Structure formats: C-alpha cells, structure tokens
Amino acid sequence: MDPEQPVKPSKPHSPEWLPTWEIFVVGLGDVIVLILFAAIGRAQHQVTSSSGPVVGTINTAFPFIIAWLVLAAALGGFSGKAFYPLSRVALRTLRASVLAGPLGVLLRAAVEAAPTQFYAFRWDTIQPSFILVATVSISVMLLVWRVAWSRARRLWWPELP
C-alpha cells in the first residue's frame, strides 16, 4: 500500500466512513447555515440589491460556501471522525471555519470587484473587523449545527462509530 495515497474506508463501521446520504445532509445543512449567516448580515446592515433579497443573499453567501466546502472537505470535515466524539466535532469544525472565514471574505471581495478591473483589487478594501466578525460568526453557527447533528445521529443510530 502506498503511504502517500489516502486510505478510503471499505466498510460501513470504519470510523472514517459516512454514508453518501449523510454527507449530502451535512453539506446541505452547512450551506443553509452559511445562507442564514449572509441573510443575518444583510439584514443587520440593511443591504438591498436589484436582484432581490433571495438572490442577493445567495450571492453574498456563495464565496463563504465555496471556501467552507473546499476547506472542510480537505480537512476531514465530511468523514465519520468529524462527528464523534464532541471534541473532534469542535476541532474539525473550528479548524476549517477559522480558515474559511478569511478565505470567504477574500473571495467575496474579489467577486465584488469589477470584472474588467480585477487587476486593481486592493487589499485595503477588506476590513479586518469584518474578517473577525465573519470568522467568529461562521465558526459559532457551524459548530452549533454540527454538534446538533452529531448528537442527533448518535441518538438515531447508536451503532455508529
């Protein structure tokens, strides 16, 4: 076996294994949490857009969704070990969310730059306070959701690792 090749669990009772439907449910829950984060932020700042509240909220959330899904997948947030015990739920969620918050802010700033002037992207347009608030908010919201899912899955399926 090649030591650099990732090990894919072959049996359902491996601690790394998650059924496909559960990956889908957790990913969907993550996306809903991030859309809720964007909706709360837009409401707090009374942001409106010509595309309407739903499309505007999804457009605001999209960079954060991409950042979270990529980092959570890369850091093991969608494996069986990401949901038990609670210390591991917290560790894997916070590890990815602390990186996804700043990356989401950066992606959002890049997306909002005029497409013809992307070369003129300026770092000084990103407020450090927004990075901090977004990162903490995303981390807390995702942690609450993932801890709730972790507890629910253990109640429904006690045989899970």
Segments from the language model and where they lie:
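Juxtamembrane/disordered regions of integral membrane proteins
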Residues: 2-161
